[in-house]
């Protein structure tokens, strides 16, 4: 319980357990713990009518992105068809909210990103990477995610890279990092987050990825 953010923290715990091979269907203490955790996340009270997971526990868009990513990773892992359907339905609703929040009018530098609330008119990298990773995971799992939403989010990350851009869109600074917001200073934490998110999106050979990796090392 991190100051009440039970939904987001439970989602992180579920992903941690899944990453080492545990599943809710496993007939052991780990499987039962995951079943209970997933049942808690799927309570109707945790997701409002908009599809938002971030209001009840105070996690805002951070928590929403984390829970959505977890649900997309848990698709097909429910203990029965009813649970699988609920995971899919709630995940798609959560994805739809992310897509709607991305379309809220922002200035040109902030377009494609997200911030603390679904109606925010600005963006930052730390919130945006969770939404982007959730979108990519959901698309990989067959949910309805326009490719343009992912490419627009990647463009936002590129604008957050601490460098002027050349006419071809590549960074002038070959060795630099990602900032909290476009125009800010490169930071270790945001550079690591931006690097991870871009790789999750398949941008393995991007000069932004190589530049951030070199800067971090």
List the predicted regions and their residue ranges.
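Active-site neighborhood of glycoside hydrolase catalytic domains
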Residues: 156
